[in-house]
Amino acid sequence: MRIDTVNVLLEALPYIKEFYGKTFVIKFGGSAMKEEKAKKAFIQDIILLKYTGIKPVIVHGGGPAISQMMKELGIEPVFKNGHRVTDERTMEIVEMVLVGKINKEIVMNINLHGGRAVGICGKDSKLIVAEKETKYGDLGFVGKVKQVNPEILHALIENDYIPVIAPVGIGEDGHSYNINADTAAAEIAKSLMAEKLILLTDVDGVLKDGKLLSTLTPEEAENLIKDGVVTGGMIPKVECAISAVREGVGAVHIINGGLEHAILLEIFSRKGIGTMIKESEG
């Protein structure tokens, strides 16, 4: 038993050395947010990353909690092509849940476990300037990222804080916009030239014929979309990954957040547990 523990530490050592001082942007969502054990393991993983010299930045989602709050308030959520229609009242609820509830819970849990987290949203210091998303028809106040101003993040990171970001952006008109958390995380990772972007999902990664694909280049990932291998909700995640890698992010990892300590297993082991997308070494 003892030698197993030593071997785990020795396997992690080269990765700890390689990533010391590097920035990781982590999108927290899916099963990892819903299951208590996975949620606790996520917090522990973040603390451990921090204490090994990595600079974690968290971007979180919260779709199910938003829908739950709407129902409690007697409002039926409306979706169009899988995207939430966000009118003025819905946007108020989105902001209340993401910024006022989920964000603060994550910050509190990190701080209770020995970290130093600060919660912000995309509106703070104009971190995320948004504009209306029209790709899927008129969804109301659903936005896409127009610009990221990462100065506030640099200030927090340099002062040893862990930024926790709710993906609510601000438009040029001063209005709040609901932004997809994967997209927000990818754009923030680009702006920070992060070493890694880690997307927590409800599946093991990118699958082909039921088998996990451990590594992909952006070109291979694109072909999987074209060939219909990557479908449904995985398409925007893979598109985010391709875009991030092509714009300066070292690697993107798509992993199952429902697995306890998924981040550590992916980052600090040779085999990993999910799909890594990065440019080919050649």
Swiss-Prot record:
InterPro entries: AceGlu_kinase-like_sf (IPR036393), AcgluKinase_fam (IPR004662), ArgB (IPR037528), Asp/Glu/Uridylate_kinase (IPR001048), Glu/AcGlu_kinase (IPR001057), NAGK-C (IPR041727). The keyword Nucleotide-binding applies. It is an enzyme of class 2 (transferase). Pathway: Amino-acid biosynthesis; L-arginine biosynthesis; N(2)-acetyl-L-ornithine from L-glutamate: step 2/4. Transmembrane segments: none annotated. The record marks 27, 237 as: Transition state stabilizer. It holds the Pfam family AA_kinase. GO terms for cellular component: cytoplasm. GO terms for molecular function: acetylglutamate kinase activity; ATP binding. Keywords: Amino-acid biosynthesis, Arginine biosynthesis, ATP-binding, Cytoplasm, Kinase, Nucleotide-binding, Transferase. It catalyses: N-acetyl-L-glutamate + ATP = N-acetyl-L-glutamyl 5-phosphate + ADP. Substrate binds at residues 62-63, 84, 178. Gene3D superfamilies: Acetylglutamate kinase-like. Its EC number is 2.7.2.8. GO terms for biological process: arginine biosynthetic process via ornithine; L-arginine biosynthetic process. The keyword Cell membrane does not apply. It is found in: Cytoplasm. Belongs to the acetylglutamate kinase family. ArgB subfamily. NCBIfam families: argB. Catalyzes the ATP-dependent phosphorylation of N-acetyl-L-glutamate. This is Acetylglutamate kinase. It comes from Thermotoga neapolitana (strain ATCC 49049 / DSM 4359 / NBRC 107923 / NS-E). The gene is argB.
